[in-house]
């Protein structure tokens, strides 16, 4: 009976409901005959990550795909229309600490005039994509540890409070520019894109 009922079943993901899905657009413009990456500096009034450098993006809503979310967020934050965005390709999905999954998309902006939503963005700027292909970021390692809640039943676990939980490691990258420090998940996405650009475009 199990074979009949589950034989064609496809594997899902445990605790899928706990995964926070987000999407970002990595915007490119043509400037001086080469590709530039457009960045946002988050508004100082925001509750999360004020003043940090990032890409336009946000949470994936229940009724949309990550690609649709990336486009929607870019339109809202950069005050541009859908026809100004040409999605070039999906980039590699990033699994971040805290059960977050970020789907980045590379996109070309047509006729971007440095507009942005003042409620979310302080200002925008661009950096040549080639610069990231020619400069490796600084890398620092962080350690991820398990901290059980106060009511955790240690008496039911071998070793009790001395139980040896597994520890994880997470690399954090930094690009230092005169415009500011590009770090964290933004830098990790950039590093991956820069490697693709260097190997698939510049060195071909």
Report each predicted region and the residues it spans:
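N-terminal leader/linker segments that precede catalytic domains of diphosphate-processing enzymes
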Residues: 1-54, 58-104, 108-113, 130, ...
């Amino acid at each position: 009976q199990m074979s009949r009922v589950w034989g064609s079943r496809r594997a899902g993901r445990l605790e899928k409901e706990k995964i926070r899905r987000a999407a970002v657009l990595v915007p490119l413009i043509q400037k001086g005959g080469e590709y530039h990456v457009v960045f946002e500096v988050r508004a100082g009034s925001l509750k999360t990550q004020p003043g940090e450098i990032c890409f336009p993006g946000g949470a994936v809503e229940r009724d949309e795909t990550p690609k649709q979310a990336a486009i929607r967020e870019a339109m809202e934050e950069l005050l541009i229309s859908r026809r100004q965005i040409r999605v070039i390709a999906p980039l590699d999905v990033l699994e971040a600490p805290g059960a977050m999954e970020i789907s980045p998309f590379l996109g070309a902006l047509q006729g971007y005039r440095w507009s942005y939503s003042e409620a979310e963005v302080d200002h925008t700027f661009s950096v040549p994509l080639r610069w990231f292909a020619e400069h490796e970021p600084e890398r620092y390692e962080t350690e991820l540890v398990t901290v059980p809640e106060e009511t955790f039943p240690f008496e039911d676990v071998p070793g009790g409070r001395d139980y040896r939980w597994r520890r994880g490691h997470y690399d954090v990258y930094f690009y230092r520019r005169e415009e500011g420090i590009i770090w964290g998940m933004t830098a990790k996405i950039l590093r991956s894109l820069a490697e693709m650009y260097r190997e698939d475009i510049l060195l071909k």
